[in-house]
């Protein structure tokens, strides 16, 4: 049976959807004002693995992941670049989708945009106001009265007294309490017209937290079976969501809360605010990038390496980014593909009941989506395939890899893609990229001719030349030679 660590209860619990066989899952998505970085990649891949395993377990999943398309950061980007809000958001939504496709992230069943649900947000604000949980401030904003919600802090484990001790009301603030947060922001004269909506409170726009309360309730109803997001959303965003939704409607917002761990860089979380981020496209693009093109050419070997780098780590554990860690991930993924290349698969599906590695894979995934343990089962199968040449083991390896969104490329084509993350490339300036496929095939043909002429010294010299350039040859029965980049 599947068990999930619930941030709310701080324990691992048996997962029981509110409606048998059906899962309503909401994940907080991107604020689209810039390119996605590797920390975003971790969240996207982590919850992609979650929804894949839920479906593989026979559950019907309604997966909603929102887009925040109105926000202070978006407004700043539009003003800085002289573009309309919609131009900014459409471009970065397209860029995000390109990143997701590159990483093998399946699209959510529904992907609502905040600006499509302003009416529903105003309805919730009205409910909160009628219950004394929201008030109109002197500056025209509508704020949530945190003091009126007794359970505030239950998700993050923070008490109101502790929170208030670290807060001060800013000079000129219209808040009654320093912890109160904005539900509706009054329009400012200097802000673009396409950031303003009519409301009972005058022209303005929604606060960030109210957006997810409206979209999750409208599309999935209450309670959600799973609500997820990145590590920095637990507080205040998800805490505020609970206060809004439960304050307005009563009952639980979500039965299970999931948060993936942070991606770390030198002991700090990767984030745009710290300036220590690397974008997804910088990491896996094939060729130059343009700031005017949302789409880009993807190196499929490097893209799968990045997904593998994320999947091999448990989603809740902090993960460290360093170039050498990507090299290690590339080498490990190459070993799995080498096993696939050495032996043809039998084409059979996964036998969960008979195969020990499949059972180990399932046990790991049922234990809070432990993809790290599942990857260990893949290496057991690869080891068996290399040791015995078992077509069954290779078939299981490919089928189980598919559950994690891995190992679906054609092995010869995979190895023919250059990579910046091999040990040779890191140490010698990517020599493997110096020869293109046509040049490599020509050298292989020369070697074959030398072997046919029994000039084995020449054949060995060509192999050595290619190896020095980062190209490994694999001679197969019947005179066929396959190649791969080291």
Swiss-Prot record:
Task: Report the locations given in the UniProt record.
Answer: Cytoplasm
Q: Where is this motif: 'HIGH' region?
A: 30-40
**A Pfam family this chain is assigned to:** DALR_2
Gene Ontology molecular function, alphabetical: ATP binding; cysteine-tRNA ligase activity; zinc ion binding
Which Gene3D superfamilies does this one have?
Anticodon-binding domain of a subclass of class I aminoacyl-tRNA synthetases (1.20.120.640), HUPs (3.40.50.620)
State the reactions this protein catalyses. tRNA(Cys) + L-cysteine + ATP = L-cysteinyl-tRNA(Cys) + AMP + diphosphate
User: Could you tell me the EC number(s) of this protein?
Assistant: 6.1.1.16
Residues bound to Zn(2+) are 28, 212, 237, 241
Listed GO biological process terms: cysteinyl-tRNA aminoacylation
Chain segments annotated as coiled-coil in the UniProt record: none
What keywords is this UniProt entry annotated with? Aminoacyl-tRNA synthetase, ATP-binding, Cytoplasm, Ligase, Metal-binding, Nucleotide-binding, Protein biosynthesis, Zinc
- Is Metal-binding set as a keyword in this record? yes
Give the cofactor note: Binds 1 zinc ion per subunit.
Primary location: cytoplasm
Origin superkingdom: Bacteria
Motif segment ('KMSKS' region)? 269-273
**Cofactor(s) the protein needs:** Zn(2+)
* Subunit annotation: Monomer.
Concerning its family, UniProt says:
Belongs to the class-I aminoacyl-tRNA synthetase family.
Q: What is this protein called?
A: Cysteine--tRNA ligase
- The species this protein belongs to is Bordetella pertussis (strain Tohama I / ATCC BAA-589 / NCTC 13251)
